[in-house]
A protein has these predicted regions:
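Transmembrane beta-strand segments of Gram-negative outer membrane beta-barrel proteins
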Residues: 23-33
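Classical eukaryotic N-terminal signal peptides for Sec-dependent ER targeting/secretion
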Residues: 1-11
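Aromatic-lined substrate-binding rim segments of carbohydrate-active enzymes
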Residues: 49-125, 143, 147, 151, ...
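Extracellular glycoside hydrolase catalytic/binding regions
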Residues: 132, 137-161, 165-268
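Short, solvent-exposed loop/turn elements at domain surfaces
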Residues: 27, 36-43, 78, 254
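Acidic/histidine-rich helix-loop elements
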Residues: 32-51, 83, 218-222
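N-terminal signal peptide
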Residues: 13-24
Length: 268
């Protein structure tokens, strides 16, 4: 039997399921469950409530309190695009109902749901959508015709967190591993515009899924791409910033960029 653990959510997120802890500190412990059918789960005719219900039940049984899911992924089935690449809608006729079933399942299992809108995969393949990032008109079409109605659906879903894009750096020049690369400033603007919409149209929190610690450091890292100053340089906005950093920490480890590789800073 899994060991019982206190289920305490990150303070900046929903307090709907939060339990008080002796230390009064919050722990966001969760699982990455990005898809069942890549890019087709929501609005792509592949919704499987049994899969997600069973998965969420298992996640909860191990004491986790959050789960991360990819929504559009590379854009293969959602949102809806016109022939010239502008976004005209959220997706197919079942997009809204699929999304809200996922949201309600997470709530029923007392899980914070981190909805990752996009992935760097949108810059790969023949049907890629890198221009959604680089072309501000197309970015705006996504915000207006897909993200805005989506946020309306999510109104009141306090256990939901929005993630703009998974590992955006792999779409960005200098680090690009995709078929089409975008300028760093374009990706920052894309992220900031999504953050602005989320903050202007909802009470939800927003982040982005940086690929490495080295991209979120003004010290010994490559750059601090996602701090307030960097995002505002790319797109001046009082609210187009992140609520918290979300950094992927995976092989190869140990990394020279991890805090564990450096002596503690003096207390001032």
């Amino acid at each position: 039997m899994p060991q019982s653990r206190p289920r305490v959510l990150l303070l900046l997120s929903s307090t709907a399921f939060a339990l008080s802890s002796a230390s009064r500190q919050a722990l966001w412990a969760g699982v990455n469950l990005p898809w069942n059918q890549f890019g087709y789960d929501i609005g792509g005719s592949a919704w499987n409530s049994t899969y997600f219900s069973t998965s969420f039940e298992s996640i909860k049984s191990y004491g986790a309190n959050s789960v991360r899911f990819w929504l559009h992924a590379d854009g293969r089935s959602t949102p809806t695009f016109s022939e010239d690449g502008e976004v005209t809608g959220m997706g197919g006729p079942n997009f809204g109902s699929d999304l809200m079933q996922l949201v309600e399942l997470a709530k029923a299992h007392e899980l914070v749901l981190q909805l990752c809108l996009w992935s760097f995969d949108m810059c790969k393949g023949e049907d890629r959508h890198a221009d959604l990032i680089s072309n501000v008109t197309k970015t705006d079409s996504y915000v207006k015709n897909a993200l805005t109605p989506m946020l309306e659906l999510l109104r009141g879903s306090k256990h939901v967190v929005i993630e703009a894009i998974n590992e955006p750096e792999w779409c960005m020049k200098s680090f690009c591993e995709a078929d089409e690369c975008v300028e760093v400033s374009d990706m920052q603007r894309f992220t900031a515009k999504i953050a602005e919409a989320v903050h202007s149209l909802s009470t939800l929190r927003v982040t982005t899924g940086s690929a490495s610690l080295k991209f979120s450091s003004s010290g010994r890292g490559e750059a601090a791409y996602w701090n307030d100053a960097s995002l505002r340089t790319a797109f001046p906005s009082t609210v187009g910033v992140l609520d918290f950093y979300n950094v992927h920490y995976c092989a190869p480890l140990p990394s020279p960029h991890t805090p564990h590789s450096h002596a503690p800073s003096p207390t001032l």
